Amino acid sequence: MITSNDQRVLFIAIGKQLRKNIRCIAFGGTAMMYYGYKDETKDIGLLFENEPDRAEFIRVIETMGFSEGSPFKIYIDEKLRDPHRPLMYMREDARFDLFVKQIFHTVTSPNMKEDKFARHEFKGTHQLTVDALRKEFIVMLKSVTERDKDFEDILTIIKKDTQFNWQYLIDEVLWQHENGDTWVLMDTIKMLHELRKYMFVEQKYLKMLTGKLGKKQAKKK
């Protein structure tokens, strides 16, 4: 497991060795630790703007003892067949899940780029900039990735944050759906059905998604 301090130390060390400035987006447990939702995580999930940035990041972590691992026991089969699955790098109990441009079918939306929770900068000769996503994006992406403990993390976020913006989440899911993400609608509907077993979520939010799904299925007939 990776603690918040482990993560900070790693990013500082990486920032000092970069040969170019790199900006990436932190999601999942990485972003949750910045919120204080959890004290440790199994992996550091990062989304890069382009392949050269990811390649430079990988070059650095390989000098630190990380080696490429297999995602086949981490993600379900459907996700593993996607060409946008992550490259995974491991060292003892630490793991990086490194995506480029999109997380499976989910792309970087205008809101993801502009509306962030926090920005962290790690400076050496060059700079590593890590932008932490706001909580609504974290929940959506955990619905999409469907890894072990992802739903537990969603439950933790919703229970701890009384100001969770459900409409913001729904709007982003619908935007992703309209812009080509063929999974996000069903994944979020599935998550909401499961979530309603544990806590109250207004029915209207689920209806906004199932209504869109119904229109999509009607068009196919």
What would you call each of these model-derived segments?
Residues M1-K221:
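Compositionally biased terminal segments of proteins
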